């Protein structure tokens, strides 16, 4: 199967969705040789991955993952592909906490650091989250308190079959975008940051095919995989069964432009402190970018009608201490579960 696929890819032909599914299934099974897997990954990188290919791969990875079956019918995720080289603090992690304080159910899917000094798993550990929590307890945490963390290696066990190859290749592959597309809770809403403008529309199309109801796939003009505050941001939104493209400018929402260095984080310990300071009400560019992205999460989470209202609600949740209280409440409940 893989040899046939390589022939096709090398001839610059796209795989059909079902072929891509079969290829990824074979890779996940552990039966594929490293050289064939490497050939597929590099071939795809050179050809460029199609929407059908990414969809097929994502479906196979979802089917090979340990699933988290939630009773709630609408759950969201806030995450990025990483790899944007921006050295920012963990914005989407702060956003997840604020969204859950507004009553949005958040299944935060993530891993340790890839391109930064601190991934969502690293910073959540610093904040007191048990990232190795068994799925059954994580499920209760999301259902009862509105937010839980799904540590990717715990759910995507078959990924160990490609970990060594990805490290050896040392270049971006399709797996860099598959992480955020394969949340084991099968979330219906998503704010997804990507490292390349060319990915926003295709990945929104993929999310649509995967059954996503509402999503914003975003990429800042400055290169960040967030809705940025140093420049406008490209957005491809999944809305009512279609993908629409537009641009968000922070100044239109009363948020002043920041400098990239204003948004930088350091290691997990410092990033956790940045998040706590924001939740305690500290003002400035770091809070601004969190509020703007939280507004998007509240919009995707169906608690506000638009970003303007989302910004008001996010600011309210911070200023009243409700967001910080929510974090305390989640950690307290986690302690009881453990």
UniProtKB/Swiss-Prot annotation:
Pathway participation: Amino-acid biosynthesis; L-tryptophan biosynthesis; L-tryptophan from chorismate: step 2/5
Job of this protein: Catalyzes the transfer of the phosphoribosyl group of 5-phosphorylribose-1-pyrophosphate (PRPP) to anthranilate to yield N-(5'-phosphoribosyl)-anthranilate (PRA).
GO molecular function: anthranilate phosphoribosyltransferase activity; magnesium ion binding
Record: residues binding anthranilate 2: 166
Pfam families (UniProt xref): Glycos_trans_3N, Glycos_transf_3
Binding site for anthranilate 1: 80, 111
Name used for this protein in its record: Anthranilate phosphoribosyltransferase
InterPro entries: Anthranilate_Pribosyl_Tfrase (IPR005940), Glycosyl_Trfase_fam3 (IPR000312), Glycosyl_Trfase_fam3_N_dom (IPR017459), Glycosyl_Trfase_fam3_N_dom_sf (IPR036320), Nuc_phospho_transferase (IPR035902)
Positions that bind Mg(2+) 2: 225-226
Keyword set includes Glycosyltransferase: yes
PANTHER family membership: ANTHRANILATE PHOSPHORIBOSYLTRANSFERASE
Organism of this sequence: Thermoanaerobacter pseudethanolicus (strain ATCC 33223 / 39E) (Clostridium thermohydrosulfuricum)
Quaternary structure, from the entry: Homodimer.
GO CC aspect terms: cytosol
């Amino acid at each position: 199967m893989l040899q046939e696929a390589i022939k096709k890819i090398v001839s610059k032909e796209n795989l059909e969705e079902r072929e891509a599914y079969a290829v990824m299934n074979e890779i996940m099974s552990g039966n594929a040789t490293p050289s064939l897997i490497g050939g597929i990954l590099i071939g795809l990188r050179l050809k460029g991955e199609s929407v059908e290919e990414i969809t097929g791969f994502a479906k196979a990875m979802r089917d090979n993952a340990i699933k988290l079956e939630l009773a709630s019918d609408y759950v969201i995720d806030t995450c990025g592909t990483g790899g944007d080289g921006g050295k920012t603090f963990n914005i989407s992690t702060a956003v997840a906490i604020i969204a859950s304080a507004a009553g949005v159910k958040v299944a935060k899917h993530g891993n340790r650091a890839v391109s930064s000094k601190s991934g969502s798993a690293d910073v959540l550990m610093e904040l007191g989250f048990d990232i190795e929590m068994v799925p059954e307890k994580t499920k209760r945490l999301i259902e009862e308190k509105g937010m839980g963390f799904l540590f990717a290696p715990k759910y995507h066990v078959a990924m160990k079959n490609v970990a060594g190859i990805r490290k050896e290749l040392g270049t971006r592959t399709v797996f860099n975008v598959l992480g955020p597309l394969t949340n084991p809770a099968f979330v219906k809403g998503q704010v997804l940051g990507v490292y390349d403008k060319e990915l926003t529309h295709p990945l929104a199309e993929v999310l649509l095919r995967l059954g996503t109801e509402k999503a914003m796939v975003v990429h800042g003009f400055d290169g960040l995989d967030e809705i940025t505050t140093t420049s406008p941001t490209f957005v491809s939104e999944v809305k009512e069964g279609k993908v629409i493209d537009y641009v968000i400018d922070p100044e239109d929402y009363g948020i002043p432009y920041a400098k990239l260095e204003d948004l930088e984080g350091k290691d997990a310990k410092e990033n956790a402190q940045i998040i706590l300071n924001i939740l305690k009400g500290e003002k400035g560019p770091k809070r601004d970018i969190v509020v703007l992205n939280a507004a998007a999460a509240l919009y995707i989470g169906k608690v506000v009608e638009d970003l303007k209202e989302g910004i008001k609600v996010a600011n309210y949740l911070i200023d009243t201490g409700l967001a910080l209280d929510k974090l305390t409440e989640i950690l307290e409940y986690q302690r009881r579960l453990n």
